[in-house]
């Protein structure tokens, strides 16, 4: 962990090491060739400048692939500030390259929780020409932390007592202290932010779940676009991305032979499907746990054994959580696992595993092996290895998803930002999805790169199906 991040005099950036910029730029150049969707959007919209002068905050993993997204947003006119959405996911050379290009970025690998939330605040803080502090007009969010901070800050300024309520979560305690500090240092700040804020596009399942929860209570402050449920995001990033990056994270962290191991994948949504198939492809024997009978049946029909976590204790070598839920692996599970077990998470937040309870366990001994790999010697003498402190193993212990699949996701994010701005006076304060026509267009932008040739419908065929020759080709309710 870099405990002394480098800061520019004008708060232009706060990163690990600006000297890494040249390395970062070389990798960004490589990634651009693997991200045809984003590069096509640049070519299409650079002259039109649909986001000209629009203040955009990003709270999303500061990786090489994200750097290509940031520069795409800038190329189409946006005024961008950025922070990572995970304390371990930043690639420091990517952050350095972006800082050198003039984009304010506040991110480094190995932030503390206090540093993480302060970086989020920095990314949300724009200064107007008259010196007034304000916020973004649009947000690119991943997990909903930037959205959460604004909502909680605004609610505090309007009488909420949430910051004074007790909390068992260490991260919640950090957020509450930050909001109390801002209330003193910047009175009325969040109200000014909300007055200018026009929309948010959300990247991941967990963040989308948060948005729907807020919207259901009538507290959503702006229109939101659910990018996660675009087919070209969830069925590609979540599935095919995890299929490659989970094993990458496990192997970089532990140099473990997966073949012959018994692995438990908790959850069989798109992320769980990709994870289970990844482990099986390496020769692991895979057990799936599920709460949903449909997903459980899917797993069984794919040949996976489906049972409970409790039934696997003392047998499994590897546990992977993928659910987006909390307390999936609890302290009573971990103390009953076999010796030398590996536990990790590829869902967005660290609360899938009871990490705080593990750290607080009486008699436990914690030994850091290397960054993002911790060895716990339990009171019963068994050893448990926890990866990335229960946060995203593919980004904490490796470099996340490959560029090509992230081009799908980030093309959706860019189109969502354009759509939110163009329709800022049309959309109500609700959660929307991008139209299927755009979803198909994102897919189309990636076909040439991998040598795909589409069949074209004849007019008679299109009429028979009741669709246009150009699409959309499937109804909204179609399940891919």
From Swiss-Prot:
Keywords: Cytoplasm, Hydrolase, NAD, One-carbon metabolism. It comes from the Bacteria. Its main location: cytoplasm. Pathway: Amino-acid biosynthesis; L-homocysteine biosynthesis; L-homocysteine from S-adenosyl-L-homocysteine: step 1/1. It catalyses: S-adenosyl-L-homocysteine + H2O = L-homocysteine + adenosine. InterPro entries: Adenosylhomocyst_ase-like_sf (IPR042172), Adenosylhomocysteinase-like (IPR000043), Ado_hCys_hydrolase_NAD-bd (IPR015878), NAD(P)-bd_dom_sf (IPR036291), S-Ado-L-homoCys_hydrolase_CS (IPR020082). Its EC number is 3.13.2.1. Binds 1 NAD(+) per subunit. Pfam families: AdoHcyase, AdoHcyase_NAD. GO terms for molecular function: adenosylhomocysteinase activity. Substrate binds at residues 63, 142, 203, 233, 237. NAD(+) binds at residues 204-206, 238, 267-272, 290, 325, 346-348, 394. One of its GO terms (cellular component) is cytosol. GO terms for biological process: L-homocysteine biosynthetic process; one-carbon metabolic process; S-adenosylmethionine cycle. Belongs to the adenosylhomocysteinase family. This is Adenosylhomocysteinase. It comes from Xylella fastidiosa (strain Temecula1 / ATCC 700964). The lineage of its organism: Bacteria, Pseudomonadati, Pseudomonadota, Gammaproteobacteria, Lysobacterales. The gene is ahcY.
């Amino acid at each position: 962990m870099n405990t002394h991040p480098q800061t520019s005099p004008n708060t232009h950036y706060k990163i690990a090491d600006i000297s890494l910029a040249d390395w970062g730029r070389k990798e960004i150049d490589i990634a651009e060739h693997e991200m045809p969707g984003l590069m096509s959007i640049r070519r299409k919209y650079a002259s039109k400048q649909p986001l000209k002068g629009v203040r955009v905050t990003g709270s999303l993993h500061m990786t090489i692939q994200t750097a290509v997204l940031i520069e795409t947003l800038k190329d189409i006119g946006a005024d961008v500030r950025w922070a990572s959405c995970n304390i371990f996911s930043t690639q420091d050379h990517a952050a350095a390259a972006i800082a050198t290009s003039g984009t304010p970025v506040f991110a480094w690998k190995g932030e503390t929780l206090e540093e993480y939330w302060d970086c989020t605040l920095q990314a949300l803080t724009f200064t107007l020409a008259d010196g007034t502090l304000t916020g973004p007009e649009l947000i690119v969010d991943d997990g909903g932390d930037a959205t959460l901070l604004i909502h909680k800050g605004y609610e505090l300024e309007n009488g909420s007592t949430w910051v004074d309520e007790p909390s068992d979560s260490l991260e919640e305690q950090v957020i509450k202290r930050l909001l109390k500090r801002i209330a003193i240092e910047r009175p009325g700040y969040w109200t000014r932010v909300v007055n200018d804020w026009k929309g948010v596009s959300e990247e991941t399942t967990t963040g989308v779940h948060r948005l729907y929860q807020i919207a259901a209570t009538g507290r959503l402050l702006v229109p939101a676009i659910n990018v996660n449920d675009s087919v070209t995001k969830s069925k590609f990033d979540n599935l095919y991305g995890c299929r490659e990056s989970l094993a990458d994270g496990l192997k970089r962290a532990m140099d473990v032979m997966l073949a012959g191991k018994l692995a438990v994948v908790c959850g069989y949504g798109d992320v769980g499907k990709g994870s289970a198939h990844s482990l099986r492809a390496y020769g692991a024997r895979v057990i799936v746990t599920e709460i949903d009978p449909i997903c459980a049946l899917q797993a069984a029909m794919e040949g996976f054994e489906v049972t409970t976590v409790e039934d696997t204790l003392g047998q499994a070598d590897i546990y992977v959580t993928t659910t987006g839920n909390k307390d999936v692996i609890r302290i009573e599970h971990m103390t009953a696992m076999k010796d030398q077990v590996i536990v990790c998470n590829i869902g967005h937040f660290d609360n899938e595993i009871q990490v705080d309870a593990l750290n607080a366990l009486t008699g436990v001994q914690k030994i850091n092996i290397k960054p993002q790999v911790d060895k716990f010697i339990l009171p019963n003498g068994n050893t448990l290895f926890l990866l990335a402190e229960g946060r995203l193993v593919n980004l904490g212990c490796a470099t996340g998803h490959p560029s090509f699949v992230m081009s799908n996701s980030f093309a959706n994010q860019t189109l969502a930002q354009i759509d939110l701005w163009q329709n800022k006076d049309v959309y109500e304060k609700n959660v929307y999805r991008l139209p299927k026509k755009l979803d198909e267009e994102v897919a189309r932008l990636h076909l040439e790169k991998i040598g795909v040739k589409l069949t074209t419908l004849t007019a008679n065929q299109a009429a028979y199906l009741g669709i246009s020759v150009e699409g959309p080709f499937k109804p909204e309710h179609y399940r891919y």
